[in-house]
């Protein structure tokens, strides 16, 4: 903590210090370091690279699959089965849990690569001044004190303080979330400001869009801002999804219930005078049979099917459990730039001749409007050739406006070639170019509204050019203020006539004619508003977290429905000194956070989590990565997103569409519901088997099932319908429900009562069938009847578990081809076992004739209408 504090104080001194002072602090000079000084600096500060994180091997990932409590119980069951001589059961259990581990490993084998991706951002090469000579070197060889040279198109290879500036503009959006390129300055900054406002500093991983400059390196490797994010990624642990927590709790509760049942059975057997050893072996065998061995594998398979469905809908799942976790999300914390917005500056409005005109309503036949468009293209250094945009995003937006109206920049520039220019700089806050237009030399001046109004004498109106009045200037200032309050970036355009063969000087930037203003912004994605509305309908709180300015963020948030009132917006500085407890009470009041750092993002996400919420964080920049990892479900943008963000996320959107997240939430809710249906199916069937065995034991009857019967049920008549239930067709009605509580258990009282009631029906019908066969021809026929009835009853029961409501006589009964297939295959197999003479010894059954087979089918089918009737009664009672 002290080291971080010292580092913060040092950075504060750097951006608040003059160029001369910083060079002194870094032990450097304008002509750079000597080789000896480089070696000395490297000994002190190390290489310009990020520390490696320890990667998990495939074997470690594979072994982690065995940490699940239910899997541990199954392993213990396999060992006990082996000791008791039941090799078949032991082998099946081992095969099932091994298959589950392989499936889980295949899905998660892409280990975290965040630090590797961060290393790529450091850039492969840097131009450095050493001994007064410019030398290209690998970026990792840079040291504190090196003087680096930068120009448009370069990535910044390390953090540094600017010492020479020629109109330098840097795109820092990946690091700060700021959508506009930042104009850099040499001036020291007096007050303490956040990262995005340190305009005399350069940061590793950012990109030069315009101009050139020199900087002295102030931090390398893990001490850079990117390095600090790498440190946050290392210290941020992944959270378990609600399903992981639920299944662990479920496994523990289920084990206790089964042990209680088996204990009761053991006590009854001993009380009846049976051998203690035999009674114990039977109780253990029953426990092994009662545990749904296939559950872990079925959940994994269902989630894998879910990932395939979501991939077709533009959402790639990197971490399997995230599929279900999405269904629990109650808060979505979204980055603004590139997530809710298009990450592309776009012209929104014109202001000309005293009127505001929407960008899509410009009249190219109007001389003033066309001249303003031409001026915006001519006084502009950006290009757009064959769809490749080069230059400052603000200037590119002006070129793209022309393209929308069929006005190509190359043609305009060819018609009115540039004869002279005064480049933009942050002191003048303007740029001037000279062109021959309609036989006259015209200087076009583009810049900040306030600055140009001070230099303006005349104004273009619909009645011609006249002297500008105080009222004109007030009206322009008022419109500029209105644009700013809407989060728009505004440029003013002016012009004047220049004498023939005159070279431009700064003195010429006076006595100008005010032409108009062009307002632009990074606009919301078209689908963002509808997606936000869907979130709110589904009980999900959308929150915007961005490094951009508060006014800009609030304007976007208001457009798409996240923000209702400006009081719901705040800046990172406001939460800087809050304790964690204060922040927990503060977050429900705020919908927009602006000018936040990566540390702020993590704290905001954590505060929501500590309030009991499941939080999804979306983003695309390096600055989002730690919060993506802290969130329960991190979501990265696949097209505009950095590799760092993608590697830290649980889900990547291939269409960068915020609406895809809402669809993913719907899929997650449906998958959780389907998994519950599968669990209901497995447990109610197993409970029916336990009740049948328990009744036989109490009544002093022979055991109704042989071990091979239980194996057959577990492998076929359990697994196939359970998987089919897992892929039950999705419905949109789940989005009308509120998110389920994060701590809601799968085994609720209501859920257990359903399992108990349905298991009782299956158990009773199985024992009636057993007694029918037993009284007809003894224990073997009784066992055959019980085995056949239990298998078929569970196949029919698959249809009961398709919904919480009766499905008979509804379209839902036939809407799952996988269920039809599972039922048909299961019925064919059990019919074959019961009727083919050659199989009776293998499966310990008596071969049945068609009349006997019909009896078994009748008892099995009887379970279906009874349970459907019970569902109808429960529904009526709940109303």
Task: Annotate each predicted stretch with a short phrase.
Residues 741-760, 780-785:
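Membrane-water interface at loop-to-transmembrane-helix junctions
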Residues 1-736, 746-747, 760, 787, ...:
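Conserved cytosolic headpiece of P-type ATPases
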Residues 380, 612, 665, 669, ...:
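Alpha-helix capping/termination and helix-coil
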Residues 717, 762, 784-798:
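Generic alpha-helical transmembrane segments
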Residues 697-706, 770-782:
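Helix-coil boundary and interhelical linker segments in multi-pass alpha-helical membrane proteins
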């Amino acid at each position: 903590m002290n080291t971080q504090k010292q580092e913060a104080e040092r950075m504060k001194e750097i951006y608040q210090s003059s160029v001369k002072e910083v060079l002194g602090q870094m032990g450097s000079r304008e002509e750079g370091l000597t080789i000896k000084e480089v070696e000395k600096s490297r000994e002190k500060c190390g290489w310009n690279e990020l520390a490696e994180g320890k990667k998990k091997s495939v074997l470690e990932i594979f072994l982690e699959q065995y940490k699940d409590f239910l899997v541990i119980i199954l392993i213990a069951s396999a060992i006990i089965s082996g000791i008791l001589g039941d090799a078949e059961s032991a082998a099946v259990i081992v095969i099932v849990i091994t298959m589950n581990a392989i499936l889980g490993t295949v899905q998660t084998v892409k280990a975290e690569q965040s630090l590797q991706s961060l290393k790529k951002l450091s850039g492969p090469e840097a131009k450095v001044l050493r001994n007064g000579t410019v030398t290209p070197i690998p970026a990792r060889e840079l040291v504190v004190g090196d003087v680096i040279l930068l120009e448009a198109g370069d990535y910044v290879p390390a953090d540094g303080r600017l010492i020479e500036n020629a109109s330098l503009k840097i795109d820092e959006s990946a690091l700060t979330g700021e959508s506009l390129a930042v104009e850099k300055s040499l001036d020291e900054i007096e007050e303490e400001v956040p990262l995005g406002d340190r305009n005399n500093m350069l940061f590793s991983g950012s990109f030069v869009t315009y101009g050139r400059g020199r900087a002295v390196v102030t931090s390398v490797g893990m001490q850079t801002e990117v390095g600090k994010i790498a440190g946050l990624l290392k210290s941020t642990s992944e959270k378990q999804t609600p399903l992981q927590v639920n299944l662990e709790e479920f496994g523990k509760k289920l084990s206790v219930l089964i042990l209680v049942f088996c204990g009761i059975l053991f006590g009854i057997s001993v009380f009846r005078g049976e051998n203690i050893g035999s009674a114990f072996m039977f109780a253990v065998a029953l426990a092994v049979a009662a545990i749904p061995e296939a559950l872990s594998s079925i959940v994994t398979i269902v989630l894998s099917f879910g990932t395939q469905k979501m991939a077709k809908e533009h959402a790639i799942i990197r971490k399997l459990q995230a599929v279900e976790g999405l269904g629990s999300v109650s808060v979505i914390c979204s980055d603004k730039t590139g997530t809710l917005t298009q990450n592309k500056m776009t012209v929104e409005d014109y202001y000309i001749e005293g009127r505001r005109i929407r960008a899509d309503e410009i009249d190219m036949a109007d001389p003033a409007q066309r001249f303003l468009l031409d001026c915006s293209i001519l006084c502009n250094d950006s290009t757009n050739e064959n769809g490749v945009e080069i230059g400052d995003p603000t200037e590119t937006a002006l070129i793209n406006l022309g393209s929308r109206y069929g006005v190509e920049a190359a043609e305009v520039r060819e018609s009115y070639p540039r004869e002279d220019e005064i480049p933009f700089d942050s002191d003048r806050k303007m740029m001037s170019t000279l062109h021959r237009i309609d036989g006259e030399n015209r200087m076009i001046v583009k810049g900040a509204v306030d600055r140009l109004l001070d230099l303006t004498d005349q104004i273009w109106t619909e009645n011609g050019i006249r002297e500008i009045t105080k009222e004109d200037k007030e009206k322009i200032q008022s419109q500029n203020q209105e644009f700013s309050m809407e989060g728009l970036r505004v440029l003013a355009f002016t012009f004047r006539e220049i004498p023939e063969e005159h070279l431009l000087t700064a003195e010429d930037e006076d006595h100008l004619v005010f032409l108009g203003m062009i307002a632009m912004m990074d606009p919301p994605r078209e689908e963002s508003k509808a997606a936000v509305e869907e979130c709110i309908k589904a009980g999900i709180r959308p929150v915007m977290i961005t490094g951009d300015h508060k006014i800009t963020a609030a304007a976007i948030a208001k457009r798409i429905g996240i923000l209702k009132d400006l009081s719901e917006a705040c800046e990172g500085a406001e939460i800087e000194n809050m304790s964690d407890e204060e922040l927990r009470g503060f977050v429900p009041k705020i919908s927009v956070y602006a000018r936040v750092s990566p540390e702020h993002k993590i704290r905001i996400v954590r505060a929501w989590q500590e309030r009991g919420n499941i939080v999804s964080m979306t983003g695309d920049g390096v600055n989002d990565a730690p919060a993506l990892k802290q969130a329960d479900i991190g979501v990265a943008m696949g097209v505009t997103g950095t590799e760092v963000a993608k590697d830290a996320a649980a889900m990547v959107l291939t269409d960068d569409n915020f609406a895809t997240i809402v669809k993913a939430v719907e899929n997650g809710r449906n998958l959780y519901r389907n998994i519950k249906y599968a669990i209901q199916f497995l447990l109610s069937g197993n409970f029916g088997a336990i009740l049948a065995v328990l009744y036989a034991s109490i009544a002093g009857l022979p055991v109704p099932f042989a071990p091979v019967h239980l194996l057959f049920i577990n492998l076929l008549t359990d697994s196939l319908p359970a998987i089919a239930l897992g892929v039950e067709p999705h419905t949109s009605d789940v989005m009308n429900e509120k998110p389920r509580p994060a701590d809601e258990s799968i085994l609720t009282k209501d859920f257990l009562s359903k399992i108990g009631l349905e298991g009782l029906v299956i158990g009773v019908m199985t024992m009636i069938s057993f007694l029918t066969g037993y009284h007809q021809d003894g224990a073997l026929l009784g066992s055959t009847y019980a085995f056949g009835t239990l298998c078929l009853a569970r196949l029919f029961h698959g249809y009961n578990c398709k919904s919480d409501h009766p499905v008979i006589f509804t379209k839902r009964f036939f809407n799952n081809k996988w269920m039809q297939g599972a039922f048909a295959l299961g019925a064919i197999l059990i019919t074959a076992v019961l009727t083919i003479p050659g199989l009776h010894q293998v499966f310990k059954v008596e071969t049945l004739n068609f009349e006997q087979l019909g009896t078994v089918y009748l008892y099995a089918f009887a379970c279906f209408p009874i349970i459907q009737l019970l569902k109808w009664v429960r529904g009526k009672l709940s109303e």
